[in-house]
Amino acid sequence: MSKSTAEIRQAFLDFFHSKGHQVVDSSSLVPNNDPTLLFTNAGMNQFKDVFLGLDKRSYVRATTSQRCVRAGGKHNDLENVGYTARHHTFFEMLGNFSFGDYFKHDAIRYAWELLTSPQWFNLPKEKLWVTVYATDDEAYGIWADEVGVPRERIIRIGDNKGGPYASDNFWQMGETGPCGPCTEIFFDHGEHIAGGPPGSPDEDGDRYIEIWNLVFMQFNRQVDGTMLPLPKPSVDTGMGLERVSAVLQHVNSNYDIDLFKTLIDAVAKAVGTTDLTNKSLRVIADHIRSCAFLISDGVMPSNENRGYVLRRIIRRAARHGNMLGATDAFFYKLVAPLIEVMGPAAEELKKQQSVVEQALKMEEEQFARTLERGLSLLDEEIKNLKGDTLDGETAFRLYDTYGFPVDLTADVCRERGLKVDEEGFEAAMTAQRQRARDASGFGVDYNSLIRVDENTPFCGYEKTQQQAKVIALYHNGNAVDQIAAGDEAVVILNETPFYGESGGQVGDQGELKNAGVSFAVQDTQKYGQAIGHVGKLTQGMLRVNDSVDANVDSQRRDRIRLNHSATHLLHAALRQVLGVHVAQKGSLVNDSYLRFDFSHTEAMKPEQIRQVEDIVNAQIRRNLTVQTDVMALDDARAKGAMALFGEKYDDHVRVLSMGDFSIELCGGTHASRTGDIGLFQIISESGTAAGVRRIEATTGENALSALHRQSDVLQDIAQLLKGDSHNLTDKVRSVLDRSRALEKELQQLKAQQAAQESSSLSGKATEINGVKLLVTQLDNVDPKLLRTMVDDLKNQLGSAVIVLGTAAEGRVSLISGVTKDLTDRVKAGELVGFVAQQVGGKGGGRPDMAQAGGSDVSALPAALASVESWVAAKL
């Protein structure tokens, strides 16, 4: 009996754990250490800084099952998903890693043992083929002479991508940095499947399938292209869980493995179909995995960046559900079966289940409101299409008006043998939106300008002053030996009391000084393991190895500490009031206020906001001790400490406890007792995305000042109403009632005026071919009354065409009315549009009533004068 996907995942991790590897949890799909990356798309992403030498771990061997998404950006598999056997938006990457420990011999030996040993995967050795980089004689020799793979099944792959080291078998992190050859292992499905071995003209067939890639990082590529040997070569491997499961379960398509068969059955049940061969089922089964895990990791549907990629995937799934006959929201119903089939890999998703389901349902229902209309428009455009390509302007209109991502439009077109002019779509988007929605905010890693090998000890938990030594200086991203007055720079010290921005807490400000030298620290940032003091030298000359007094702005730090501690109290209070589904989605803590984003699907009620505020202030009055303990990460979790999912934590973590009320993992600076916070006030509560709410609040003196401002405003209002703050509500209600009564009276007077105006105007109508025509400009008439006047005039005149215009505050208002007996010849919408374009405007409406506006008041008389000839031509 073949292993299940869950058993294969666990077997991989167990094997490498038995070889001395640390089992590391999957990191978030949102990379927290690489702003150039849209989504985590490989197992090595969370170890990038380790490979670059910017981060150190307590272990030198690691193994993971990493959740990955490839949709959008460089790795965009979206259009192929569901139509091929192996393309996915979401997949799991099994990997083992060596950070300067073992290298090629052990990496290859481990891979062969796991794949072929009867105790593990027990694959037939004769079914396995291997590729190596053309000049990697070492790897070739290990496979041939030590492992015993026949040389005819070891294929050398050279530079097949147009340049030196540009090869399927040479891996590079970027244009510079760690790189090296790789060896790939392929499984031969047999002669009954079309395709040739790797490197052959028929290699794209499905017979030989790559199942494992072993990367040997042994070089450091320089700017000039030279390859320098790394002092400690490393290993990074990746094996797609879905691919190896297909091999071990003896099926040729990933969609036939147990995991996908379960999901496809769930999709069929949700949409009410029995045809399990329909490719739309595969599309939806894939998409629920990426969408659910992305939302669980904090991404919400939006029109920007990651949120827009998520929206595209959800809407593609919704459209395929529509094709299968789904009439109601169904996608969210797949979260529960997904959690069940993913098993231990879905623990975090299970905690967020209700939030994920609600976000999916809201997005699907929102799209459903425009899906049918958009598809009808697309059908109409395709019917009238000349050629085989839909123009970019139409694709953009579908996106802009009906929310159709361009790849969804491309899907529909492809099903009918058509293409989409995607370049034209991008041009239309740029011209009409003036911004690119799918890439903004990514692509520039400013921290990469500064590479610091040092580790800066932080001593700022205990003090805000420290004598230290300058160990590095950076000016314009380059290391320098000295800086002069006026230079902006980053200063690295051998130790510092300055807190580097992280965990939502802003970096410290202050001063570095010695005799005749002053460096104003405007911000503090982390550069790998180093803490950088960002600012400007205002006096003297600062050199590497100089001693300085590092002085944090302690008053500013104190305000930040209070706000940060209040954030923890707020988090715990929200979970009490709203439920344990509340999880932190982001935060900002500075010296003025705190901002806290959290998972919740609806706006908080005023009484809930008050309840949260009261709970936090009650904990402040309890004056709880704020205690910090350093312990193993597993011990902290066992103690119940809340962690921010996706955040990277060391093996030992700081656990912050506030009495019996709050316990969280946190590396920030805090009050010593909750009473130090003094006062907590919520300033605002709002939504930032589907399923994410935001609270802004303030503490201490800032909160007191906010209360004083509110009190002052109430006193000012009371004086204006000639009352006091005690009866202010009654006074305001009385004023509003009086205002509404006067407004009603005014509208009645205006209606009477309009009726009188209509009576006087009816006598000014002329006649064309038996039809009354009334065209006139009115002065000092409320534009809102024009519609009433037109209705009155139509009743008075009988068969008639009416155009009224008025100008007020530099704007033209136009209205056209046509009695129903004439709308087959004269349409009010066309008529008012004809007039509006002459006054710099546009408008439209029904055939019998239409309105428009314009900006050229001076052109109004001439525009109205042109109406008679236009109407005459129609009659």
Swiss-Prot record:
Q: Which SMART domains match?
A: tRNA_SAD (SM00863)
Q: Which domain of life is it from?
A: Bacteria
Query: Which Gene Ontology CC terms are recorded?
Result: cytosol
The record's cofactor note says:
Binds 1 zinc ion per subunit.
**Which principal EC class is assigned to this enzyme?**
ligase
- Principal location class: cytoplasm
Enumerate the UniProt keywords alphabetically: Aminoacyl-tRNA synthetase, ATP-binding, Cytoplasm, Ligase, Metal-binding, Nucleotide-binding, Protein biosynthesis, RNA-binding, tRNA-binding, Zinc
Q: Which InterPro entries match?
A: aa-tRNA-synth_II/BPL/LPL (IPR045864), Ala-tRNA-lgiase_IIc (IPR002318), Ala-tRNA-ligase_IIc_anticod-bd (IPR018162), Ala-tRNA-synth_IIc_core (IPR018165), Ala-tRNA-synth_IIc_N (IPR018164), Ala-tRNA_ligase (IPR050058), Ala_tRNA_ligase_euk/bac (IPR023033), DHHA1_dom (IPR003156)
Location comes to: Cytoplasm
Give the binding site residues for Zn(2+).
H564, H568, C666, H670
Family according to the record: Belongs to the class-II aminoacyl-tRNA synthetase family.
Q: What is this protein called?
A: Alanine--tRNA ligase
Q: What is the scientific name of the source organism?
A: Pectobacterium atrosepticum (strain SCRI 1043 / ATCC BAA-672) (Erwinia carotovora subsp. atroseptica)
Gene that specifies this protein = alaS
